[in-house]
């Protein structure tokens, strides 16, 4: 019985991981119960095949404590030469009725947000992500952004 259960578990694991063949990097980092405006989430990317193209995504886990309809992020890619390309991005996080977008059956949702397409990497890169949310009509940023629990970065190989 124990061998049969182990075999079923192994088969389930193989099926689960084989369904995601495009993934070459996928990592999350926790930001706790609130994402502080000065907290930068950094990912050290692996060295990838420089002849292939990749699609890049910012992944988020959020819950019903997220108080806004959209999200502003500052994403910086640091190249091996030290050059840094910075983008300010806006993503819709909630439907017009206020329910969170994303995948998940509980109050925790996962959102896979498109960042860049057809990117080639030549060497070792770093990605830095910080939140840049502001309340409507206010200049200072939200000090501690509630509702975002984890920030991730994902790289998929282009077909």
Curated annotation (Swiss-Prot):
Top-level division of the source organism's lineage: Bacteria
InterPro entries: Motility-assoc_lipoprot_GldH
Gene source species: Flavobacterium johnsoniae (strain ATCC 17061 / DSM 2064 / JCM 8514 / BCRC 14874 / CCUG 350202 / NBRC 14942 / NCIMB 11054 / UW101)
Membrane topology: Lipid-anchor
Name of the protein: Gliding motility lipoprotein GldH
UniProt keyword annotation of Signal present: yes
Recorded phenotype for the gene knockout or disruption: Cells form nonspreading colonies, cannot digest chitin and are resistant to bacteriophages. Whereas wild-type cells can bind latex spheres and propel them along their surface, cells of the gldH mutant fail to do it.
Function statement: Required for gliding motility and chitin utilization.
Residues lipid-modified (S-diacylglycerol cysteine): 19
Chief location of this protein within or outside the cell: membrane
Gene: gldH
Matches recorded under Pfam families: GldH_lipo
Alphabetized UniProt keyword annotations: Cell membrane, Lipoprotein, Membrane, Palmitate, Signal
PROSITE patterns, A to Z: PROKAR_LIPOPROTEIN
Biological processes annotated in GO: cell gliding; chitin catabolic process
GO (cellular component) term, any one: plasma membrane
Residues with lipid group (N-palmitoyl cysteine): 19
Signal peptide: 1-18
Subcellular compartments: Cell membrane
Keyword DNA-binding attributed: no
């Amino acid at each position: 019985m124990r061998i049969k259960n182990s075999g079923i578990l192994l088969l389930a694991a193989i099926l689960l991981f084989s369904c995601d063949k495009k993934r070459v990097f996928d990592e999350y980092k926790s930001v706790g119960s609130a994402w502080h405006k000065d907290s930068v989430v950094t990912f050290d990317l692996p060295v990838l095949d420089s002849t292939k193209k990749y699609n890049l995504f910012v992944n988020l886990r959020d819950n019903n404590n997220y108080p806004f309809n959209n999200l502003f992020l500052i994403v910086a890619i640091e190249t091996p030469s030290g050059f840094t390309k910075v983008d300010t991005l806006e993503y819709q996080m909630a439907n017009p009725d206020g329910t969170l977008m994303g995948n998940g059956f509980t109050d925790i949702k996962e959102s896979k947000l498109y960042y860049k397409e057809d990117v080639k990497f030549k060497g070792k890169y770093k990605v830095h992500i910080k939140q840049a949310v502001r309340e409507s009509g206010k200049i200072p940023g939200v000090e501690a952004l509630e509702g975002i629990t984890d920030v991730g970065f994902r790289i998929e190989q282009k077909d």
